[in-house]
Amino acid sequence: MKFSRILDILGFLSILGANILSTSCQKKSDFINTLHNSVLYNAHPENSPLSNSQKSTLNITAMDTFMTIQSYGDKKNAEIANQKAKEELLRIEKLLSVTDIESEIFRINHHQNEWQNVNQTTWEVLLEAKQMAQLTHGSFNPCLYPILSAWGFTTGSFSIPENDTIQYLLQFTDFEKIEFKDSYKIFIPQNMMIDLGGIAKGFTGDKIIQILKENGIESALLDLGGNIQTLGTKPDGTKWNIGIKNPLTGEVAASIKVENMAVITSGGYERFFTASDGKKYIHIIDSKTGFPVDNEIASVTILSSSGTYADALSTALFVMGTEKAFSFWKEHRDFEMLIFTKDKRSFATEGLKNKVDFLDDSFEVYWKNYF
């Protein structure tokens, strides 16, 4: 085993973290193109059944991505609500950033083998992350930071680690070893490092929706770096129309009508590198092997009332592959799912039958039911 390479990785991690959340956003006149999904706008606030409904839009860069919050209602009230949502977003980012030396996650990661007092929010999202890891048997895993770093996904200096390095680092990815105490205390063992990039945006979206509700907003749309979350319906009383991208071409392949819903996609097309042998390695890691996932799935979209749940599940079910993903869906029955595969098949759960329109006929559609 080449310990010099391992020590280089662990030494680097001891002084520096990197947030792996990354996205791009391109605006068009009739819809917003995000990394994963599109919001197809047909809302006409002037015809809204909501009294004095006007749109207040907040654009912000946070968690290393571009985000938009659109709230509808009384103009002044919507602006106040958006400002409070912004404050909450920045507060959560400050707590959960893996790079900010003043964040609580950074402190936890750099004080291993010590109990750390944390904010209630940090404690809550870490508990949610561990529970999602348990629920998915490690397909979602918040402890993969050292392995992501070994592959270069935290720095952009990509390389294929030696197998001995991967096997060594896998020792430090056992999420069951994250410990919790009352009064908001957290413990992680030596050499473990937490990265909440696979759940933080969904968790944040849930908190923002809660704040908007508390401030009298009944209609809102969040686009948090490709994570879409909606509050209520559009101002005209109709459902939001969310476009799901064809992961092979970037065009809109399907549209889904939703209200009070998170629509979150994971795909292997947004962060990857191509090695010298021509093989593509994506940023989604299988925690059982330490290697980037290489299966038939091109993207997984989850619909759930919980952004936290949808965010973690979209990654977990991508890792599982199509067959195990649908077995999980049949067992839990508390979300809907749309999968696009590399060989141009699309699999959709039966709960989407009256909600989704397929716009790309190059995909063969398969409907899944509980039986």
Q: Which stretches of residues belong to each language-model region?
A:
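Mature catalytic core of soluble alpha/beta enzymes
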Residues: K2-G11, I15, N19-F371
